[in-house]
Structure formats: C-alpha cells, structure tokens
C-alpha cells in the first residue's frame, strides 16, 4: 500500500536504497539480433572487432503470462489491483510457427482511507484497459496495422486515469488521508515491441539470460529525486522521507502527474515482471532472483506456480503489505523468411 496521498513527500517505508536508471527509449519497429561471422583460423584475442555481421529480425514464437494478488499478512484489505488483456494469434508456416500478439498488462497499488485505495486502483486499471483497447480497435477499424501506441498517446491514457480518480475525490469531497490515489506500472506489448509506463513505486523488471535481472523503472520517491539532483545516494536515503512518493494517480490534478514512458525491443527470450512494493521491498527479487525468477524464463516452467511461489516468498520475508505480481514470458526466434541470400 502506498503512503498518504495528501502529502506525497512525508513519511517512511521499507525500500532498498539504490539508484535506478531507466532503460533508454528505442525507435525500432522490429526486433533484431546480430550474429558475428568469424573464420576460426583468423580469430585472435587481440583481433579488432570489425568482423562482418548478419542482422536477423526476430519474431515472437510464444507469449504467455500469469498473475496473482494477495492481501499479505498484516493488511485487512487488498488495495492492489491488476488487469490483463491480451490477444494472441498463432501463425503456422512450413518454416515454423510464430505468434502475433497485443497485450496490456497493468498493476496498481492503491492508497486512501474508507476503501479509497481499492477504488482508485480498480478505476485506474479499468480506465487504462478501455482506453488502449479502444485505441487498437480504432486502428483496426481504419484498416491500419495495429502498432504500439506512441508516447503521447500513452501519456494521454495515464492522465485520463488520473483525472477519473481526481474527479471522484472531488465529487466525494475527500480530504487528507481519505483522498484516494494509486501507483501505476503498465506494459503494452505489440509483437516484439514493448512500451512501459509508470507512476509511483510499483516496478517493472526485465530478466534475460544475458543480463540477468534489470530494474527498468525508477521509483518516483524523494530519495531518487534527490539523486537525480546530484545528491549522493547515501545522503539521499538518509532523509526520513526518502521513500515517500513524489507522485501518484488521483490525489492531484494532471499538472502534478508526469509518467515515465520507455520503449524496448524483445531481441532474446525475455521475462517481464510487474510488481507492487509488497514484493519488491528489501531487495527481495534481487536477492532471490536465481531461485525464483531465472527458472521462469524456461518454456518448461509453470508460470502460475512460479507466481504463487513469488507471493509465498514475499509473505515469508516481507508480508507487511499487499503483494501483486504479473509475469510475462516472451520467446523469440529469428525470422528467416525476411532474409535474402
């Protein structure tokens, strides 16, 4: 559960002290991978890296997901909420199978008294699902090939969700700690392109065999804000309000909300993990990634069971908050049909 929505820069929590650098935007529309063609007789350790390369486009061979939410051990109500809407089409050819996929994966961690957090998180998820489903529907109706929404469209959707919650606060005359709000982390998948948007401290991680576990999002909290201003991390997180949110959806109008939006290409088998802070607190995922995250990238791993085990792990070592996880597993292979020899 996120802190008091009325004063987003006061209070404390239990988060890891670390600097997070979001992954840079990319402009590719098709994932590619590079293969170096080397003559074994010419390979040497001091050889310059100027060998010819073949750039292979990649396409999805499979996309699946699993999700679960849990109230935790100390909360009476679950203020987390998530939503998944995915359309996956199998394509079979003599050269091998592939899939075309569009998916919207949303996780929100609500806050606010008198059931406000539960209402806010659900409002945000449903508003965003409807917005992006309508966006893709309009593309199909105009006979356009559905593409990943551009950053301005994603921002429009996030601000719409903020406005819906803000208007509810105003209509119900909610004040102080009763004012409802929510964090947001969202992944939008269109084949091998992924857009990530977030507000608050709910996170998205990416796991690959090459790079291991990477935190893609950067928490919107006082400590991270101070680090971006040049303050040393150890000083930034010595503040009593270091873990307090600097923005959330709902408590304030759109002038105070600026979602972070990034684009990525899937060019190798990848696992995406969306998580509320009940799962990410105390470096839990970083500490246990080898046993609880890494195995899930295998096609043989049961994602539903893996998510249940992540929830159990969080209850064992955290348990102080609601816990929610969404896992997305993307498998890719080279698109050899696009290669001309």
PLM segments and residue spans:
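PP2C/PPM-type serine/threonine phosphatase catalytic domain
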Residues: 1-341
